């Protein structure tokens, strides 16, 4: 008991208070009782009802905080002598909703069954039917990334996170393709894969920082915005400006960490090392300004970075012609030199920032702009020997270039697109193909070709390989599905390749185009040989592919646990070929003969079988392990011969010295 102003209060009665969510409403008795009303916290409300604290403030001042991004910086007073960009007073942040889509919005909400119209309310709600949802948290899944590595990454970890994300994305795309198309539903397996990786800790560089990001290199390419988020290069999944709040002289203030120049605004500049960047906001859609931009959030952060001389990471967004999508190239650090306000094409004020690339960095965007000029022929490629060494055999030209010495080209060979098999190398008996009309539909188990692939279509809708398998079975030319997408390796080269002279490894192969992980590059063309008959001549043949070699194992497929699948369903990634296959491209071959060995390759080989001239043969197809930037040499692991044994404790010791220069170089191959 406690005395208070002459009265006694029994405090034990106060301690028995229950949370509001445990109380049940008490309805008045009688037929004239008013109906029970349920209305949104911001209204509208029926007559006689009003909101209660904390929802009593105006709706305009309410917004959902973005838990994945830094909160809006506090308002700063306008200085007495502002620069041109400060000519407008910044409005209150609360009146402008966040442009960044929270990652939690990609998860499906837990809803009730059926439809309901609330009696006595002016608001009608349609409650969708309950459906199973995937939880991003899985107590049984271990990401394998500790807290320290999650905050600060390295090159190996960055590549691992990107590979795991894309493997999961390809699996989700495969599952979506197998479903019936629903009108108005846009399939975004990248968002689903990204939110899953975020929720389960498959990410790195979560500690936001300006400047260099550990493990991310200049020239790295990304095909999805979520990839940049997972490796800490650029956190927002939609906004073009990323920033963090730091302590200023008198108060906290935002500084920009990175920007994405998506090309939606007038950002083009003749000099590839200079970027005129348009601020964010004021746009109803991506093509047209609808109102004046405001000095807040990212725009304010860029202005503060200008005053602090703080470098900003720049990611260039480019159009990918082959898939009608965007590709992003990390172009390094830029310094903000000046800012101003000008009228845009739509007549509204926009903030402009001039950024200049820091000197001493390797080229990235500049190389891409040079490649676009090479494709037009003006100017011509420096060191060009032949514009098309295939003489039109390939649908896309393959250039021959030497910028190293005076060598005019490799030794003569016949260019071909098909493997030459003798009668003794028909590896399998022909089988009946499918009877699908026009194309094989993913998920159709009546298709003979899909059944041979284990019930799953081996490629996504845009021709990307989903998983490595012991063998992939493609539809043959004799199948009636003329427009089938299960003929990826039979369609020839689809990227602009270049054979070039290397500094210390002879001729090599690279691409003018960025190559997406899982993309088909080419098959290995040559003459099939009997290993027992060519054992002696193989030592003098630098253009031999041997499927019997021993290769370093590596993990490329998706993780069933990350996809909420049974781990026992994980398929083998080891190739299985019925008979030893050796292909010599010394006299007859294609561009594959110029791919050099690397102990850390960016390309892998996959056995593919399809019928040709009423006989089934195995072909060696090459696919990209990861995203490959333009002008990066394409390499694969040659492996070592099985009888080589061990040397210096290394079971993979080959006959030839390796010059790949990789940090994981084993010193030899072949």
UniProtKB/Swiss-Prot annotation:
Location(s) in or outside the cell: Nucleus; Chromosome, Centromere
Binding site for Zn(2+) 3: 440, 475, 481, 484
Binding-site positions, S-adenosyl-L-methionine: 505-507, 541, 543, 593, 596-597
InterPro entries tied to this protein: H3-K9-MeTrfase_plant (IPR025794), H3K9_HMTase_SUVAR3-9 (IPR051357), Post-SET_dom (IPR003616), Pre-SET_dom (IPR007728), PUA-like_sf (IPR015947), SET_dom (IPR001214), SET_dom_sf (IPR046341), SRA-YDG_sf (IPR036987)
Keywords annotated in UniProt: Centromere, Chromatin regulator, Chromosome, Metal-binding, Methyltransferase, Nucleus, S-adenosyl-L-methionine, Transferase, Zinc
GO biological process: epigenetic regulation of gene expression; methylation
Catalysed reactions, as listed in the record: L-lysyl(9)-[histone H3] + 2 S-adenosyl-L-methionine = N(6),N(6)-dimethyl-L-lysyl(9)-[histone H3] + 2 S-adenosyl-L-homocysteine + 2 H(+)
Molecular function terms, GO-annotated: chromatin DNA binding; DNA-binding transcription activator activity, RNA polymerase II-specific; double-stranded methylated DNA binding; methyltransferase activity; zinc ion binding
Chief place of localization: nucleus
Domain Post-SET: 654-670
GO cellular component, one term: nucleus
Residues in Pre-SET domain copies: 432-492
PROSITE patterns for this protein: POST_SET, PRE_SET, SAM_MT43_SUVAR39_2, SET, YDG
Tissue specificity statement from the Swiss-Prot or TrEMBL entry: Expressed in leaves stems and flowers.
Principal EC category: transferase
Binding site for Zn(2+) 1: 434, 436, 440, 447
Occurrences of domain SET (ranges): 495-639
Assigned protein family: Belongs to the class V-like SAM-binding methyltransferase superfamily. Histone-lysine methyltransferase family. Suvar3-9 subfamily.
PANTHER family the record matches: HISTONE-LYSINE N-METHYLTRANSFERASE SETMAR (PTHR45660), HISTONE-LYSINE N-METHYLTRANSFERASE, H3 LYSINE-9 SPECIFIC SUVH1 (PTHR45660:SF73)
Comment text on domains: Although the SET domain contains the active site of enzymatic activity, both pre-SET and post-SET domains are required for methyltransferase activity. In the pre-SET domain, Cys residues bind 3 zinc ions that are arranged in a triangular cluster; some of these Cys residues contribute to the binding of two zinc ions within the cluster.
Protein name as annotated: Histone-lysine N-methyltransferase, H3 lysine-9 specific SUVH1
Organism: Arabidopsis thaliana
Name of the encoding gene: SUVH1
